[in-house]
Regions:
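Loop-helix junctions at membrane interfaces
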Residues: 1-217
Length: 217
């Protein structure tokens, strides 16, 4: 696929997801937009300047941390957009617009999943921070989307390599990426960071009135 076609496909993916997000969430407060922007910027910095590349296109980084963190602090749509925008932009700045297409989708999935588990299943915002099982629920919410990425990353990577890059790439190679463990290590490390940051930041952000109250999308 030509570079122009990659850019057009990326534009279509971005417009579709942003449009769907607006329809789903409908309103974003100024504070939510600001915090989402901060998380997107942190995702970009964490990936672009603090990553360790590996053979085969994999790399160790903590960019996904801020995708899941935004989802827990705000909601799934905000978290998904923070990671999708921040990390897709990081791919573009790194000269990989083809990767940015699948990155945008993958990070949005992480955010939506973490947000759904945190706010729909566990209703973290309504829980007492000192209640029994609170820490376990925070860990599970953070891990949900990040561990799902262990499987969605190679799956979408297969379609990217075959249909966007036109490479010789097999399902077996995609499964090898799972077995390689780099994405899993990323997910575990990011989960630990998310839990620590969430427990530290939530009380302060609540006192500052920067977090939404009640049930969220």
């Amino acid at each position: 696929m030509s570079t122009t076609a990659m850019w057009l496909l990326l534009a279509v993916v971005v417009v579709a997801i942003v449009f769907g997000s607006v329809l789903y969430k409908r309103t974003f407060t100024t504070k939510e937009l600001a915090l989402t922007g901060v998380m997107a910027a942190l995702s970009l910095v964490a990936y672009l300047f603090f990553r360790v590349p590996f053979y085969g296109g994999s790399s160790f980084h903590l960019g996904n941390t801020f995708t899941a963190l935004a989802a827990l602090l705000l909601d799934g749509v905000s978290g998904g957009l923070a990671g999708a925008i921040g990390l897709a932009l990081a791919d573009i700045l790194a000269g990989d617009p083809g990767y940015a297409i699948t990155t945008f989708v993958l990070k949005f999935i992480i955010g939506i999943t973490c947000g759904a588990v945190a706010h729909k299943a566990f209703k973290l915002r309504e829980l007492d921070k000192h209640s029994s099982g609170y820490l376990v629920k925070v860990i599970m919410a953070a891990a949900s989307g990040l561990l799902l990425n262990v499987f969605t990353d190679p799956f979408l990577g297969y379609f990217r390599n075959v249909y966007i890059f036109g490479q010789e790439y097999t399902v077996a190679q995609a499964l090898t990426k799972i077995a390689g463990g780099v994405t899993f290590v990323n997910s575990v490390a990011s989960t630990v960071c998310v839990v620590v940051l969430y427990l530290a930041l939530r009380p302060a952000l609540e006192r500052a009135g920067l977090l939404p109250k009640g049930e969220t999308n």
